[in-house]
């Protein structure tokens, strides 16, 4: 029913994916959701916004270089090589040449583990390649800015990453925000201290991981 937190996303996903050109997808993403609040007042998540971000990135990159340039090939593929990821990431799904940002990647389990582990380390290849102010906030390393409240006081969203305050579950003496990635259908990738990672992929709509984190904390303290 409409009480499902994913209803808005589920209800309109097929109509977006069925569009057969990049232009049609962009028009759909721009017009599909009626403006209900002034910008900055109400936090709303739609994966179609990541498509729009990808279109903007491609346009920016081509204006900076030339019309044949491609931000995925030119920027991301070299980063994937540096991270030692598998060749399945070399070519994303596309729509008339535009990377299908938001949905278009195929990854091996080892790719997930490598990316997540590097993200959770304070010093990694991402230190050189990403805007450090935005990255630190996304990784919850900037206590003054935890991000937008999402559903409850223990959940935040910041620069593309979710975060959960695990302090009450783990009985920490102070806040312990764990960044995590969440994917459609039942995907969770939780970034733990010092390069540790918990990830779970399913199609069953299961997003719970607090019990697992509590168990991991008993063997390798997270607080």
Model segments located where?
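Alpha-helix boundary/capping residues
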Residues: 33, 119-122, 141-142, 216-219
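Active-site Gly/Thr loop motif
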Residues: 85-90, 137-202, 206-209
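Solvent-exposed loop and edge beta-strand segments that line ligand/cofactor-binding
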Residues: 37-46, 98-106, 179-183
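Substrate-binding/catalytic groove segments of enzymes
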Residues: 5-6, 63-64, 122-127, 168-172, ...
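Short, gly/Ser/Thr-rich active-site loops of penicillin-recognizing serine hydrolases
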Residues: 209-223
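Active-site-adjacent helix/loop patches that line small-molecule binding or acyl-intermediate pockets
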Residues: 1-85, 109-113, 117-121
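Active-site-proximal binding-pocket segments
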Residues: 74-140
């Amino acid at each position: 029913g409409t009480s499902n937190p994913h209803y808005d996303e589920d209800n309109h996903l097929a109509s977006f994916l069925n569009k057969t050109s990049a232009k049609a997808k962009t028009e759909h993403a721009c017009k599909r959701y009626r403006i209900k609040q002034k910008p900055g007042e109400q936090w709303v998540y739609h994966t179609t916004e990541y498509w729009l971000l990808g279109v903007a990135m491609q346009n920016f990159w081509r204006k900076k270089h030339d019309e044949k340039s491609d931000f995925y090939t030119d920027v991301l593929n070299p980063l994937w090589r540096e991270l030692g990821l598998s060749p399945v990431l070399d070519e994303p799904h596309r729509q008339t040449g535009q990377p299908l940002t938001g949905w278009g990647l195929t990854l091996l389990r080892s790719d997930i583990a490598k990316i997540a582990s590097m993200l959770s380390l304070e010093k990694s290849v991402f230190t050189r390649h990403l805007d450090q102010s935005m990255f630190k906030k996304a990784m919850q390393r900037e206590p003054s800015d935890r991000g937008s409240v999402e559903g409850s006081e223990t959940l935040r969203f910041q620069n593309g990453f979710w975060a959960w305050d695990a302090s009450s579950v783990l009985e920490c003496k102070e806040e312990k925000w764990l960044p995590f990635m969440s994917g459609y259908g039942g995907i969770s990738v939780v970034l733990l201290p010092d390069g540790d990672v918990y990830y779970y992929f399913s199609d069953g709509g299961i997003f719970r991981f607090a019990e697992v984190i509590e168990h991991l904390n008993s063997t390798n303290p997270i607080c």
